[in-house]
């Protein structure tokens, strides 16, 4: 299964996967507005490649059911909170 991947100029780390290049007909208008003008990144064969941030099966399922897949950036790490949790576990 081939898919085209686009990145958002508005939201860093946000990517849109669609089955056909430049065919955004299945993407809701509200998502298109929030995403901004898509910037083409690459064409990928999902049968022959793993993806770095997302599960290939989830991408394929979403594209079959909804006509697209939206990849959001991972949540930012809260280093202060992690430090506090480690400290709390260390105290007897």
Curated annotation (Swiss-Prot):
Secretion signal, residue range per the UniProt entry: none
Top-level taxon: Bacteria
Pfam family for this entry, one: YcgL
Family matches, as PROSITE patterns: YCGL
Cysteine pairs bridged by disulfides in the record: none
Residue stretches making up the YcgL domain: 1-84
Region of interest (Disordered), ranges: 71-92
Xref: Gene3D superfamilies: YcgL domain (3.10.510.20)
The protein's name in its UniProt record: YcgL domain-containing protein VC0395_A1544/VC395_2072
Protein source organism: Vibrio cholerae serotype O1 (strain ATCC 39541 / Classical Ogawa 395 / O395)
